[in-house]
Amino acid sequence: MLVRISEIEVVSQSVDEYQRILGEEAEASVRLEPGVLCIFPSAQRGNPTQIRILEIYANRDAYNAHIRSPHFQKYKTSTLDMVKSLRLVDMQAMDAKAMPLIFKKMGGQP
């Protein structure tokens, strides 16, 4: 399993458009890619230029397939001028066995 947090700062004039494009990409990734377990974007409360994305992939191959996908490439090229900074932080799941229980508990809830 590969777990990553993307820390993104967006140009303030582009926040709405960036969030729209990111939302489309996240939905397509989870729907179309079996190895993408989670793409969960969030904006910092009170500071929407600060975006964090929790990304969970089945493995490194799933991640590599994801970044080559047409929807990710469209997202990347469409938002290039909107991103002020990007930091990718690889994480180590402390209890990977509990993760499926979290998603099961969600039971399709929004």
What role is predicted for each listed range?
Residues 1-3, 8-9, 13, 54, ...:
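Residue-level marker of intrinsically disordered, low-complexity segments enriched
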Residues 2-9, 38-67, 105, 109:
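Short, well-ordered beta-strand segments in beta-rich or mixed alpha/beta enzyme
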Residues 2-41:
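N-terminal first-folded block
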Residues 14-16, 61, 96:
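Residue-level signal for secondary-structure boundary sites
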Residues 24-38, 56-90:
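An amphipathic, aromatic/His-enriched active-site/gating alpha helix that lines ligand/cofactor pockets
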Residues 41-49, 76-110:
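Glycine-rich beta-strand-turn "strand-cap" elements at beta-sheet edges
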